Amino acid sequence: MLQVQGLQIVMKKDLRQLLQGFTFSLQPGDKAAIIGEEGNGKSTLLKLLYDPALVEEYVEWSGTVQKDGMILGYLSQELTPQEGEMTAYEFCCQDPAFWEYTPGELAEAAKKLGFPMEWFYGDRKMKSFS
């Protein structure tokens, strides 16, 4: 279970408050959506939930975050120059978790996401995807 209680996030540079008193919990299998205008802290919230060290340079935060055995992942919105030159297959191969799945399981996941398998095994570079 992922449980967040009384989360407050404040930007260090201008003291702008992104969240105040934010509380929620997710059980295994639950789904959630974070919707908001650009620049209002959606990515900051996700980074903080994944690893608070990712945001410590630019925000102050308080509250509690309990992951209780949940495995979280975070995929940055921007690729490094090296990642941009990789194919989708090369990019995925970097993550040890990738090797825990059979080709059939990967194909099923790609199908659910609407991701054509030829994109995965083709020569198209990561930087060309939107």
Spell out what each predicted region is.
Residues 4-7, 14-30, 63:
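Conserved beta-strand
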Residues 10-13, 69-71, 76-130:
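ABC-family P-loop ATPase nucleotide-binding domains
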Residues 35-37:
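The feature captures the beta-strand-to-loop junction immediately N-terminal to the Walker
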Residues 40:
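ATP-binding Walker
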Residues 43:
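Walker A/P-loop
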Residues 50:
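Helix-to-loop junction immediately C-terminal to a conserved catalytic motif
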Residues 58-72:
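Conserved ABC transporter NBD signature motif
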